[in-house]
């Protein structure tokens, strides 16, 4: 499964974990302004905003998992199995396949008002990319530096929710996830005072007891609550190093270790990668399961007026910076 989050210091940060039992060979992909997107039902788009994100490239087409555009909008698709239902292609509407939803939004939206206007006339359909790539059951988080929304296509239509916590995981649906945060209304980063009974002499015996009851398992509902609490209470300096470090700490609160989430005999879900995008500056940072050294790709270091995507395979081998000894 997966977890996505937003965070703001001086700049705006957006990212996610990809938690799964295997990789599709995803890469960091920069799509320049003049790459020709061929949308299945909406024709060609030859000019658009530049995009950087994590994608599986199939037939020279970037199938984005998460991405930002040069205007500072971030978007990620996360598993929503059992609840996602896409519409049928309808004449007279802007029919957008789920696999092209991220570039459809990021290629043309510079503000969240533009995102909302686009969604109001969009028909999200289940047209597959290819026979071997059926439509994935997803829902999405879209955000800029000021706000975030969640988009879910379900049996009764397309729903757009304000997302005040800037977090998305998987099931259950977003409205239910938000409601369940009521269960944690008493949690605090501060040490608790005895409100159990004034005549019972109860005292704290450890630091961190204000968050007793915050779930620690790897289910999507628990990850939602844990990252929401961590994100909403996280304190960071404004420098790039401090901000990026803090963002990775926020998503690190739901890091999945091999062996803790068995999905089949001998197969385990792990955090394949964690991303942190500085959406203000167009930089894509990431770590992988075996490489916790933060790697970075800057979209503005490439020719953004080009026609061909630039791909950077993830550096997955662990790296150690020695202070003495072996180099």
Task: Please identify what each model-predicted range represents.
Residues 15, 76-78, 151-152, 285-287:
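Beta-strand residues in well-ordered beta-sheet regions across diverse protein folds
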Residues 20-22, 81-83, 156-159, 166, ...:
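Short, surface-exposed beta-strand-loop junctions and turns on beta-sheet-rich folds
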Residues 1-93, 121, 126, 311-315, ...:
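A contiguous strand-loop segment
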Residues 28, 68, 149-153, 275:
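Broad, structure-driven detector of short, well-ordered beta-strand segments within folded domains
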Residues 92-128, 240-248:
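Proteins synthesized as precursors that undergo proteolytic processing into mature forms
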Residues 112, 116-152:
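Aromatic- and glycine-enriched pocket-lining scaffold segments that form the walls
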Residues 1-13, 127-128, 135-136, 144-147, ...:
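C-terminus-biased signal that marks the final domain/tail of proteins
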